[in-house]
C-alpha cells in the first residue's frame, strides 16, 4: 500500500484508520469509532475545543447520501452541488487534528485563520500564501485534498477554471516538493473519482 494511502480497517468489529501500514488513531490517542455516528461525535468534540463552527461537520455528515448522488450528476447541475462541496470542504478543518501529514498542533490557530481566507476569498493562483504556510510548518496536504478545497471557489467544473486549478496545484507542488504527485488527468470524470476517494477518508461506510 502507498504510504500516502488511507484505509479504514475493521478489526474485531471496530474501525481503525490507517495511513499506509501505520495506524493513525490508537486507543490511547482517541476513542475508537465503531459507527459513523461515533466518528461525528469525535469530530464535534474537537471542533468545540478549537472553536470551529460545529454546524459545518453536521452538514457534512448529513449530506452523505447526497454526496453519493453527486458522483453520478452531470456538470451542468451546479446549484445543490456547490452547497454540498462547500460542506465537504469544512471537514478538512477537523481532519487537521488527526492527519499526521497536515498542519501541526502548534500552528492550528493560524491554520484555521488562513485556510478560509486563502481558499474562499482569493483567486486560486493566490493560494501560494496558504501553500507557503503549509510548507513552512513542515506539513503536506495531498493533492486531491487541495483539489477539493479549491473546488469550493469554482462555480462548476468548466474549462474556465481548468488553468487556475492546474496553476494552483503547480504552486502547491513547488512549495511542498510534491510536484511529481500532481500529474493527473483533469477531466470531469477524473475529478469526480478524486472526490469519491476524498469522501471515503471521512466516512466509515463504503460508497
What is each stretch, according to the model?
Residues 2-23, 29-31, 35-207:
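Non-transmembrane, aqueous-exposed alpha-helical and coiled segments at domain scale
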Amino acid at each position: 500500500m502507498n504510504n500516502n494511502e488511507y484505509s479504514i480497517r475493521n478489526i474485531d468489529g471496530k474501525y481503525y484508520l490507517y495511513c499506509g501500514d501505520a495506524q493513525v488513531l490508537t486507543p490511547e490517542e482517541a476513542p475508537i469509532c465503531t459507527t459513523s455516528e461515533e466518528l461525528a461525535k469525535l469530530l464535534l468534540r474537537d471542533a468545540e475545543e478549537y472553536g470551529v463552527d460545529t454546524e459545518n461537520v453536521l452538514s457534512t455528515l448529513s449530506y452523505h447520501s447526497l454526496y453519493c448522488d453527486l458522483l453520478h450528476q452531470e456538470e451542468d447541475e451546479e446549484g445543490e452541488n456547490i452547497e454540498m462541496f462547500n460542506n465537504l470542504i469544512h471537514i478538512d478543518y477537523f481532519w487537521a487534528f488527526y492527519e499526521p501529514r497536515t498542519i501541526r498542533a502548534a500552528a492550528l490557530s493560524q491554520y484555521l485563520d488562513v485556510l478560509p481566507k486563502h481558499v474562499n476569498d482569493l483567486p486560486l493562483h493566490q493560494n501560494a500564501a496558504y501553500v507557503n504556510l503549509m510548507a513552512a510548518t513542515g506539513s503536506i496536504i495531498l493533492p486531491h485534498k487541495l483539489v477539493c478545497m479549491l473546488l469550493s471557489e469554482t462555480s462548476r467544473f468548466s474549462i474556465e477554471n481548468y488553468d487556475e486549478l492546474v496553476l494552483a496545484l503547480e504552486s502547491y507542488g513547488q512549495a511542498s516538493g510534491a510536484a511529481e504527485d500532481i500529474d493527473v488527468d483533469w477531466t470531469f470524470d477524473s475529478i469526480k473519482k478524486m472526490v469519491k476517494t476524498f469522501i471515503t477518508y471521512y466516512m466509515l461506510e463504503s460508497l
